């Protein structure tokens, strides 16, 4: 294998020659490119997404999926793979049974994609619980995964919460083969500390009640919040772990109220009840702040919270999520191109700014595409004869990523984690999530305001 070099990729390189019309969310896009860019490349190269597109997650997954497909369409238009045919497949890891993301479906999707020898990488999954099921399959099959949104730290590194009996994640066992997993978003080690700092110093809450949804992401985030919040002198007055199928939280709200909680922290997703907690807080007349992580920051939270007697209950709710890249100069071109490509889509999918991870899906796919292109270039402009060797070479290129895109500058550390970190605090204001400040944790472990 030729030793990969560190290339500097820019958003303009991939966006050249405009945008093609998008296809549906559960679809395949194919185009045969002319013999330019990589002279004489022959064969088919496939990339894919695996994201939750239906059910309770329908307000989340379609955004990074559409963004990733936009990146593929631009690559096809720019003939990024030269004479090779670039093909795109979209997979939905939601099921009717789960009314949203389903780890078993995710694993089945990756198994199916891995069985196709032309598939060189996948953008996804969206949820950490799905990642736990997918990573071992991808590892065994040498297939690159790049998540736009997974934040559970145990997916890539061993931290204290991994051994908690309710989480019990053996990080090493996730990789029976090659380490092929990467993510373009920071982990909950940072998010938990930032959330704790916000609860104590922005919301001025000295007592907090915790609720989590029993999943890898939500439970892990709640435990990290607890660790940092109590270390700062805060008191956890109660903690409840409930399954994602829970539809009423009145008992927990009553407990929090009776214990004098000055805020509630929810570790989990909107699909697993985050907005319903806010709804039930309103019904109980419990008017303290609700704070959640990135799993709560979507339009479904607002509609769920406002579905009770008080139709403005979502107002004033807080959540930390992916940095508000709409304020970055580096993202302006992407959001303009997204709007042009999907102007005919029904709201809210016609506006990429409505979901924080939209741009993350775009950069993740562009990073994958550039890694494949670099692999072809290093092999004389042709796919490697062995599909496994081709996949291994793509993963090797991903490890050397140095990419300037919508998110700014992205590189990966030895664990596959992005070095471009931070989380934005959002607040529901006049019916929409509005970014307040972006925070990061410095090398000394202190929470700082980035913007």
Regions found by a protein language model. Give the residues of each.
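Extracytoplasmic ligand/sensor domains, especially the bilobed periplasmic-binding protein
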Residues: 119-240, 289-319
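Extracellular/periplasmic periplasmic-binding protein-like sensory domains
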Residues: 278-362, 374-376
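Segments of small-molecule ligand-sensing domains
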Residues: 343-358, 369-436, 449-450
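C-terminal motif of bacterial Sec signal peptides marking the signal peptidase cleavage site
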Residues: 19-22
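Extracytoplasmic "Venus flytrap"
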Residues: 35-69, 75, 91-103, 126-127, ...
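Bacterial N-terminal signal peptides that target proteins for export
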Residues: 1-12
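Bacterial signal peptide processing site
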Residues: 24-26
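Beta-alpha junction/loop-to-helix N-cap segments that form part of ligand/metal-binding clefts
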Residues: 4, 29-36, 59-64, 78-169, ...
């Amino acid at each position: 294998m030729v030793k990969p070099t560190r290339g500097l990729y820019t958003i303009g390189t991939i966006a050249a020659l405009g945008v093609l019309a998008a296809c549906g969310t559960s679809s395949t896009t194919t185009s045969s490119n002319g013999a330019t860019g990589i002279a004489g490349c022959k064969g088919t190269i496939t990339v894919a997404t695996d994201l939750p597109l239906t059910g309770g997650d329908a307000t989340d997954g379609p955004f990074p999926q559409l963004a990733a497909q936009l990146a593929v369409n631009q690559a096809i238009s720019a003939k990024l793979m030269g004479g090779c045919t670039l093909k795109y497949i979209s997979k939905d890891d939601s099921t009717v049974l789960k009314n949203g993301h389903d780890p078993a479906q995710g694993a089945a999707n990756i198994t199916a994609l891995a069985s196709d020898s032309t598939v060189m990488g996948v953008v996804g999954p969206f949820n950490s619980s799905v990642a736990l099921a997918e990573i071992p399959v991808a590892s065994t099959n040498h297939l690159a995964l790049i998540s736009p949104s997974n934040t559970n730290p145990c997916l890539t590194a061993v931290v204290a919460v991994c051994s908690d009996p309710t989480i019990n994640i053996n990080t090493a066992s996730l990789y029976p083969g090659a380490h092929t997993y990467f993510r373009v978003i920071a982990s909950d080690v940072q998010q938990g500390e930032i959330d704790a700092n916000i609860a104590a110093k922005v919301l001025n809450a000295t007592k907090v009640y915790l609720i989590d949804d029993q999943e890898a992401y939500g439970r892990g985030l709640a435990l990290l919040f607890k660790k940092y919040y109590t270390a700062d002198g805060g008191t956890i007055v109660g903690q409840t772990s409930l399954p994602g199928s829970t539809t009423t939280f009145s008992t927990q709200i009553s407990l929090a109220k009776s214990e004098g909680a000055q805020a509630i922290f929810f570790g989990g997703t909107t699909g697993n009840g985050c907005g319903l907690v806010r709804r039930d807080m309103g019904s109980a007349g419990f008017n303290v702040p609700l704070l959640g992580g990135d799993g709560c920051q979507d339009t479904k939270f607002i509609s769920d919270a406002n579905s009770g007697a008080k139709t403005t209950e979502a107002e004033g709710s807080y959540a930390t999520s992916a940095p508000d890249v709409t304020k970055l100069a580096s993202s302006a071109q992407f959001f303009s191109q997204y709007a042009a490509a999907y102007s005919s889509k029904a709201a809210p999918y016609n506006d990429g700014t409505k979901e924080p991870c939209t741009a993350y899906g775009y950069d993740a796919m562009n990073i994958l595409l550039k890694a494949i292109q670099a692999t072809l270039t290093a092999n004389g402009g042709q796919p490697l004869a062995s599909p496994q060797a081709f996949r291994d070479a793509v993963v090797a290129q991903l490890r050397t990523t140095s990419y300037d895109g919508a998110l700014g500058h992205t590189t990966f550390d030895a664990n596959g984690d992005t070095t471009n970190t931070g989380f934005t605090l959002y607040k529901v204001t006049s019916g929409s999530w509005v970014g307040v400040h972006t925070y990061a944790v410095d090398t000394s472990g202190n929470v700082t305001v980035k913007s």
